[in-house]
Amino acid sequence: MSDFNAIAQQFTEFYYKTFDTDRAQLAPLYRENSMLTFEQSPFLGTANIVGKLQELPFQRIEHQVATVDAQPSNESGGILVVVSGALLVEEERRPMSYTQTFQLLPADGAYYVFNDVFRLVYPAA
């Protein structure tokens, strides 16, 4: 079994660094059967996913990852990655909390994002 924790950590660092600098460069991480659920809205396929990420209404963002948890997820070598953290958008001084879950599947000696679920986490009222 490969070191799923190391793979999850490397993936997470790459994903958020790329997201924060040039979201279009995330396209190779997805496939036509990949799905993103962004705040309850589903997007299927690379073009729709990257289109959604590029149309987000901000230019500058900084993800601050707090936790990365990973588990092997199936017999074919998939990895479930759960990330929590905070993000700063544009000139905001107060970070917003988020959680994001990725299902990584192996293909051609690498991994791609099969499932991606993003959710902002608001304080309890």
From Swiss-Prot:
Database matches in Gene3D superfamilies: 3.10.450.50
Pfam families attached to this UniProt entry: NTF2 (PF02136)
GO CC aspect terms: cytoplasm
Keywords carried by this UniProt record: Allergen, Cytoplasm, Protein transport, Transport
Chief place of localization: cytoplasm
Subcellular location: Cytoplasm
One biological process term in Gene Ontology: nucleocytoplasmic transport
Keyword Transcription: no
InterPro entries the UniProt entry points to: NTF2, NTF2-like_dom_sf, NTF2_dom, Nuclear_transport_factor_2_euk
Domain called NTF2: residue spans: 7-120
PANTHER family: NUCLEAR TRANSPORT FACTOR 2 (PTHR12612)
Free-text function comment from the UniProt entry: Facilitates protein transport into the nucleus. Could be part of a multicomponent system of cytosolic factors that assemble at the pore complex during nuclear import.
Protein name: Nuclear transport factor 2
